[in-house]
Amino acid sequence: TDTVADTHTLPLEERQHLLDLLSQTLNQDPPNVETTRECARLTHHFAQQQTHPHERALMLALPECWPLLQALSQDDRASVRVVLGHITQGQALDMSRFGVGLQAIETERALDDYTWLVAGCVGEFWTDLCIRHVPDFSSLPNEEMMDLGRQYGMGLQRLNILRDSK
């Protein structure tokens, strides 16, 4: 979804449509054949327009991810869907907010909301997976670990913002 959101050489409307379709496809359980096929078609079209070969390869490989998602346990599949739902929501917000050029995020609250959507939720996601799959992951309580994961992700996104502002 990062590739879709960040490919500024393609029209904003195309990127928004594909991001929405990816989100729809991700949340179908079981997958809808027609939607999955349309997503693959648009992804292939989108990939052909990529100038970076690794981004192109990533986009072309996307349809192979849907069966892998289905192979995950129900809990892990739900976690993937939740985190990608938050991320795509943040990316859609990015595209609508910054689609016509850079604009400042006006308040600390708006910055926190943004950094949580695109990165804090990722820290929570990985913490959740580790709690679920890594015995004795931490001696700290799970809630405290989730808060640390969230803060870590949000902090990394703030660093990305500073890096990108140069």
Residue spans for each PLM region:
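Acidic catalytic motifs of isoprenoid enzymes
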Residues: T1-K166
